[in-house]
Amino acid sequence: MSVITYRQALRDTLRAEMVRDDNVYVIGEEIGLFEGSYKITEGLLNEFGPKRVRDTPIAEEGFVGAAVGSAMLGLRPVVELMTINFSLIAIDQIINHAAKIYGMFGGQTSVPMVIRTPGGGGQQLGATHSQNIELFYSFIPGLKVMAPSTPAEASSMLRAAIRDDDPVLFLENLGLYNSKGEVPDDYAEAENDDVATIGRAGVAREGSDITLIGYSRMATVANQVAEKLQEEEDISVEVVDLRSLRPLDRQTFVDSVKKTGSAVICEDDWLTYGIGAEIAASIQEGAFDYLDAPVRRVAMAEVPMPYAKPLETAALPGVESISTAIKETLSAVGKRVG
Amino acid sequence: MADTAKPKGGSAKASGSRRRNSRKDTSGIANENPDALLDLYRRMLFIRRFEERTSQAYTQARIGGYCHLNLGEEATVVGLMSALRETDYLYTNYRDHGYAIEKGMDPKRVMAELYGRKDGVAKGWGGSMHMYDTETRMLGGYGIVGGQLPLAAGAALAVSYRETDDVVMCQMGDGTTNIGAWHETLNIAKLWNLPIVFVVVNNFTGMGTTVDMSSAEPDLYKRGSAFRIEGERVDGRDVLAVRDAATRLVERAREEQTPFLLEAWSYRMKGHSVVDPAKYRTQEQKDEARAKENDPVAIFGDQLTKADVLSEEGREEIAASVKERVAEAADFAENSPHPDVSTLFDYTYATPVPNESRRMPADPVFAD
């Protein structure tokens, strides 16, 4: 095993897939000469040349759509959208085209493409650059949506996404690029394994008192919460990392809730109509008789994200707010008095 | 620039002067292969009758949804498709029935798609707006205005990536030249040297909004100039003119590996779709759109008759065979089975993965 950053896991895996398959190419703004806004594509232009590392004008609808069209002819584009906020410019091509072409034409042509894009608040980027709108894509049949939280997941899930024949929205996170984690030594070239499976959640940490569910950055925050509560309060938290937002692996978190009897969901998006709402609804349907307390959601404050640091910090869910929700839930259950 | 006819980009009324220039010199016909001319005529008439049958089937509720016809655009459709090789790719908007047939799809299966049947080209999943066939490389009719443009550029990018000599043709209506995808796509097509021909079928009306109402530059063929894309305008009522202009640009795109723009103007004989009575048109405009002198099938038939290529007998024979084939298509569609409901989840994903939802509306989320 070695310890690498989430960024390096993505970069090395992307490179390895480009070496493996000539049909894989990368396309997006500032990915070549500039080497990527977040340096995921560093070195690729030098190694593969401009044909396979295609810098684009600032024209998200145009280049995302062009990637879709090239995928219809069998290329396997990996699109980089500088942030998920900019996907709104390309949303017609993602939802009305990439997601529809396979079904709408009776299964004649698949669209094997990946759209890599980071979400994530907390960087003082203000209202239009701090949104987490993966929900829009998770809502759409025909798309697959993946959200890795660790370097190991980032590597194996990116590989799975590139090798999949359907359009995959691959959610990264600004706050995770520098995070480190263990990966197998041959991570970049490894064949698919269980970590990578699209449509499967994972139990990131076993526990018995309560289930804490998150994805992407919030899965890593969930692990921190679990560790802290174990140490400080002797609370045993089971952490479920969703990994795949569509398809959604309901069974994994429902099984966990059946074991623990209660659940808190932490999400970086807004609460109302958010991904947590779907998780909570699924829990009540799948584990109604096992629930000892209402399912709680910890989510962003429902405001356009402010710039000023104290306001931004207050708006975001974090270790403190999640811990509070867990302790309140367990108090209600009567297991603990928080 | 082929700019002999000069639509002012507005209502049909505003550009009525075109009619006086519309009579084509038939001398060019003498140099053409008579059988090839008759073939063009037969194909145009086929689209005319096919679309009339489609309209009828729609009003009989055999066809549902939105349904846009190529009536009045037969010369444009046939002329454009005559310029493509079988291996060239085609993307169109939702007014796609004629293109699908002309690109090589079996009309029976096109009609079956309109009927939403199992034997339809898209197995009944697409309908009128979404004809598609990988074999004939008609890569889709698209319902979102402008949506097909980036896709077509992407197909051309793949052609360029693989260094084959295919060309992509991307058809659209006049209204499309105002949407963002137009500008983004033309820019990248030129920037990346893509072998693609953009074709604007200008019938002067985007639904009910005229080109004058919507385009600050109503000479649509000029609208590639911001991207240094050469444009031409052609009389879309003239099948030979369309064929020649399209062939020239398609071959230049193939040779020079760069995009071109062709504007073909003609009349939309009926409303925007089958159900649109076109009340926004004056009687004069309606008369003009349906006038014999603007009817591409009538124009070409008369030219061929004058040139002694098409006899009265030949005309009847072609009409009878077209009628028969259209009837066959309708019969085929009528007798094709509806898609089986058990196939509902077959085309959501190409690569199966765990936890795909196969839940019917009343099913619980957890089936067991």
Model-predicted regions and their roles:
Chain B
Residues 1-76, 270, 278-368:
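Conserved acidic/glycine
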Residues 25-26, 31, 38-39, 43, ...:
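Mixed-charge, polar/low-complexity N-terminal
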Residues 52-56, 60-192, 210-216, 221, ...:
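Cofactor-binding active-site loop characterized by glycine-rich and histidine/acidic residues
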Residues 85, 106, 116, 219, ...:
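Alpha-helix initiation/capping motif
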Residues 94, 264-266, 348:
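A general secondary-structure junction signal
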Residues 100-102, 208, 272, 343:
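Short acidic, gly/pro-rich beta-turn/loop elements at beta-sheet edges
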Residues 138-335:
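Glycine-rich ThDP/TPP pyrophosphate-binding loop and its adjacent helix/strand module
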